[in-house]
């Protein structure tokens, strides 16, 4: 057995270094679960979920995109030889130095939720395509991200008007219902809000073709969430490019 092959001398109780036990087959099975339940969605893995190089290499080989929130995360993906076109800089409030770095790395897609961010992007990365992050109801989630990120729908017209004034290219909408979401209907509500944001984009002369549906997917109720997402997408959207966050790893790495 595998246990019989463990070198007890190098794994004794006095060892000073921690380690993870990884089942990459589980990561692959989680990916296939995505393909089965949400075949119309292009997965973008949130690197912050687990930046273990073996996991990242596997997901890159499977063709996933990557959701990065920092310069370090972006660099780790680029160092693997992944094209910058497969990266979304999903941090809506970045330091000016981060925006300059993204421009130098040819990152062409990022999120925003405030006017100050638009001014920074106009100054340091004006050719970047933008995704407006909207606020959703994350009250049923373990980790509620709405206290930090996301523009209320009432603010979206003002943001889009400023983006148009600055001649910036807004291409879509993103949201996050919060990590550890136990209410599948939260996704329907978020997709309904996203539809309204798409309509606001059209009113400001934009044609959105990108929707990032965030993360929050739980292992135990993923099929229930996927059912709601499929139904809501049929109700509110035609065939767009959709990007979920990072639910491929939690059950595969301990």
Q: Which role fits each region the language model picked out?
A:
Residues 1-110, 115-128, 165, 169, ...:
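A charged N-terminal "starter" segment
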Residues 30, 55, 73, 98, ...:
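A general structural detector for well-ordered alpha-helical segments in enzyme core domains, enriched
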Residues 46, 113, 131-135, 174-176, ...:
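Short beta-strand segments
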Residues 104-110, 142-151, 179-187:
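Flexible, glycine/proline-enriched loop segments at strand-loop-helix junctions
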Residues 165-179:
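Internal alpha/beta core interface subdomains
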Residues 186-254:
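C-terminal active-site-proximal or functional interface alpha/beta core segments in diverse enzymes
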